[in-house]
Design a protein with these regions (language model features):
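Acidic, metal/ion-coordinating pockets
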Residues: 1-177
Length: 178
């Protein structure tokens, strides 16, 4: 939980992190992840140390959920041999564009790759695909920001992502797109 009152609970993520360290949370998977070729996770939240950031309005009043943790929480992923994080989900911009940029910086500081598509404007700050090659086979990983997905919108992100999949396949940049 990213809300301040949840940080004080003895069994909160925050308290357990302080007590047990970054390696605790995925310790039962770390050996498995270390042996695989590529571990990919969905990072469902914002990593930022900027306490001046406020949750963005999701149009749900007080019924929405906003997730945030300090940037050091990226160590949870690197400690477990996670290599790549999808950042495109409905919580990516819970704390606005700055929160998103802070999340990217935190993930990159731990040596992790990331991917996600946020808009069709080809802004390198908000769009990235991840390419991985093993034994001569290249895959491209893509994900799409949930809030903006409307498959019926011919100018929306869904149409744009379908176009990108087609272009990557036709250009030979990847053998498979996931």
């Amino acid at each position: 939980g990213g809300e301040d009152y949840l940080r004080t609970a003895e069994d909160s993520f925050f308290a357990v992190y302080e007590r047990e360290g970054a390696g605790y949370f995925l310790k039962n998977f770390a050996d498995f992840f270390a042996e695989d070729d590529l571990t990919v996770v969905n990072l469902e939240g914002v990593l930022t140390d900027n306490n001046a950031l406020y949750p963005r309005d999701k149009g749900k009043g007080d019924d929405g959920y906003w997730f945030r943790g300090p940037t050091e929480y990226a160590k949870v992923l690197s400690a477990a041999s996670v290599e790549v994080a999808s950042l495109a989900n409905n919580h990516a911009f819970d704390y606005g564009a700055q929160g998103f940029r802070d999340t990217i910086a935190a993930v990159e500081a731990e040596g992790l790759g990331w991917f996600g598509t946020y808009n069709k404007n080809r802004d390198p700050e908000t769009e990235k695909f991840y390419f991985y090659t093993k034994d001569g086979v290249t895959i491209c990983l893509m994900s799409l920001l949930w809030d903006d997905y409307n498959p019926q919108d011919p100018n929306g992100n869904g149409a744009y992502l379908r176009q990108q999949i087609s272009e990557i396949k036709q250009s030979g940049q990847a053998d498979a797109v996931i």
